[in-house]
C-alpha cells in the first residue's frame, strides 16, 4: 500500500577529511561500539576516521605494495556484560586485518601506549541487552583538526600472512574473533586462526577452501547459533557457497546457492532484530538467519534454509542429548531464493548491508544509486494461513558520488552532535572518487512540512 509508505530522503551529512587521492574501496565501522570507521584505499593505506567529527583519527600505511582492497576489525572480548577494549591485555588491543592486491594479508595492532582512552583511564563500555553501549564512548583527541597528532606511528604492522597466489579481494573476522578468512582472485578461501600466546602474533592456516571455480569476491561470517560459525562466500562463478568446521578440525562445504546470473559481489547475514520480528512466538526452534546477496545481474536476493526432515533412522546429530561438539553434522543443507528485492539498479550491485538495528537493507553499485528497502507485512491469504511479507523501496538516492561508481555502503550509528535520538543511524558510502561520505535519513517529509 504505497499510501502507508513513509516519505523519506537521504541527505548529505559530511565528507570524511582528508579524502583519499585515489579510489576508496570500502569503509568498515568498528564493531565494538567505538566511533571509528576504517576505509581501505588504492593508495596502499587504510584511513581510520572519527565518526564523531568526520576527520582522520589515524592511518595504516607502509605494509602493502599494492592497493588495500579490504579491511576488517577484530571483534572485542565480552566479559561479564562489558566490552573491554583497552585494559592492557593482548585480546583487548584494537586489531585490523587488511587484504591487498599484493596477495598478502596484514594484521595491524594499536600500540599499547596509544590505545583509546577516556581522559587517562581505560576505555571500558558496558553493553546493554540490545548490544548497544549504555554510555557512549569518547576518543582521545589529536590535533586541532581532529586528526591524530601521532598519525602513522600509532598502528603497528604486526605480521604478514601469505599464501594466496593472486589479489586478495576481501577479508573478514568471524563474530567470535577465532577465525580470520580471506578470499582471492586465485579462486581460494584461506581460513586462519591465531594460536600464539599473548603478543606473539602467531597464526596458523586451518583450511584452504577450493570449491569455487572462479575469482572469489566476498566472504561473510554467520555467528554461532549452537552449531558453529558458518562462512558464506560469493564468486565470479555466479554461486554462493556455505562452509563450516565439522567439529574435528576439517572444513567442508555444506550448501551451494545457485540462481544469480552474474558475479556475486556482496553478502550479508540477517541480523537478530529482523529474525525476531519474523519468527513465530510459538516456535521452540530458533530460525536460521536468512542470507542477503547482490550481483552483477543487478538484483538483490534473499536466501532461506529449507527444512530438512529427519531420516527414518535418525543419526546422532538429531540427538539433542549429545553435545554438538560430539555430533557429526549433516553434510548438505538446502537453500532457496525466497525473495528478490524490487529492482532499482541498472548496473552491477556492488554492496549491500542489513541494518542490525532497524532491519532495513541498503544497496549501491556501479550506477551510483543508493537504495533503502524495508520488509512489510501483507497479511494472510487464508484464515490461519502463513503471514505473507513483501519488500518495498523506501527511497533512492541518485548519483551519490557524482559520475563515479560507489563501491561500498554500510549502516552505521551516529556519534556526531547533530543526531536527534540515541539510536539514530546514518549511511556511509565509499567511491571511486576517493571520498567516504556520510548520509542521514529524513523521514516523513510531507508530514513535517504540514506541521511547519
Swiss-Prot record:
KW Repeat (keyword) present: yes
Pfam families attached to this UniProt entry: WD40
Ranges of the WD repeats in the UniProt entry: 20-59, 63-118, 163-202, 211-253, 259-313, 344-383, 405-449
Xref: PROSITE patterns: WD_REPEATS_2, WD_REPEATS_REGION
Keywords in alphabetical order: Repeat, WD repeat
Family of this protein: Belongs to the WD repeat CIA1 family.
Protein name: Probable cytosolic iron-sulfur protein assembly protein 1
Organism: Sclerotinia sclerotiorum (strain ATCC 18683 / 1980 / Ss-1)
